[in-house]
């Protein structure tokens, strides 16, 4: 059995753990998330003033502070902007987009996003250990 350890239980760490667990056949991989905090997702709960700003549909190179906005165009064009929202939809999360293009969970509650991620991690057998420090 292959073992995958994810360091950090923030939004990216939880998403990585979920993706790793989903991509392997059942029983082929053991995924563990290690986080130094007493609970995972602390910053996720604070994002978007507690509403969890998931995405922005109006991203353009001109919105970034850079000497050469044109250099960002091919980078942004290479990103599948719909993929994150499709991923959340596949997990069962309903979203809404406000007039400024910001995407939030339909409930407007970051806690619902965290609960959804944690529920899928539990269902897939991902072990989450909090209060851990990792030394190299």
State the predicted function of each range.
Residues 34-35, 97, 128-130:
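General beta-strand structural signal in soluble alpha/beta enzymes
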Residues 1-12, 32:
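Beta1/beta-strand and adjacent pyrophosphate-binding region of the FAD-binding site
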Residues 5, 21-49:
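Glycine-rich FAD pyrophosphate-binding loop
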Residues 49-99:
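Glycine-rich active-site loop/strand segments that organize a redox cofactor
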Residues 30, 94, 125-127:
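Conserved beta-strand segments of alpha/beta enzyme cores
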Residues 72-80, 99-119, 129:
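Short beta-strand to alpha-helix junction loop
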Residues 130-136:
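A conserved short coil-to-beta-strand element within the FAD-binding core of flavoproteins
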Residues 13-17:
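Short glycine/serine/threonine-rich phosphate/pyrophosphate-binding segments
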């Amino acid at each position: 059995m292959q073992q995958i350890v994810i360091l950090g239980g923030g939004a990216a760490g939880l998403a990585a753990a979920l993706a790793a667990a989903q991509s392997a056949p059942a029983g082929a991989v053991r995924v563990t998330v290690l986080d130094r905090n007493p609970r995972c997702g602390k910053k996720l709960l604070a994002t978007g003033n507690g509403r969890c700003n998931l995405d922005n549909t109006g991203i353009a190179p001109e919105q970034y502070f850079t000497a050469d906005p044109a250099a960002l165009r091919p980078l942004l064009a290479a990103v599948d902007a719909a993929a994150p929202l499709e991923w959340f939809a596949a997990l069962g999360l309903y979203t809404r987009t406000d007039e400024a293009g910001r995407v939030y969970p339909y409930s407007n509650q970051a806690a619902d996003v965290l609960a959804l991620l944690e529920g899928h991690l539990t269902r897939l057998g991902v072990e989450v250990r909090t209060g851990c420090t990792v030394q190299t």
